[in-house]
């Protein structure tokens, strides 16, 4: 998240929700840790409309696994503690 982290993103999302604005979450080339944090944050906001968190696919490898799953173009978090990364 290029806005200052999870806290700043939630603050922006709250302001948008108060004003009836829907959200689109996106990223640049990011690790699975960062994308997992953004996905968890996006899914916690009722005004999230679109999610485009595919930056990991541009990277050749990552230090961790897990974090989320992507099936049929739909991203979802894993049923694991924390961000679900290991």
Regions found by a protein language model. Name each.
Residues 1-74:
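Shared catalytic-loop signature of beta/alpha-barrel
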Residues 79:
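Catalytic-core signal marking the mid-to-C-terminal active-site face
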């Amino acid at each position: 998240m290029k806005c200052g982290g999870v806290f700043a993103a939630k603050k922006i999302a709250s302001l948008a929700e108060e004003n009836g604005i829907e959200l689109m979450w996106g990223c640049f080339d990011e690790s699975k840790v960062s994308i997992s944090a953004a996905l968890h944050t996006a899914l916690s906001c009722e005004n999230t409309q679109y999610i485009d968190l595919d930056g990991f696919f541009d990277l050749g490898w990552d230090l961790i696994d897990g974090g989320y799953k992507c099936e049929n173009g739909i991203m979802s978090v894993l049923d694991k503690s924390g961000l679900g990364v290991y």
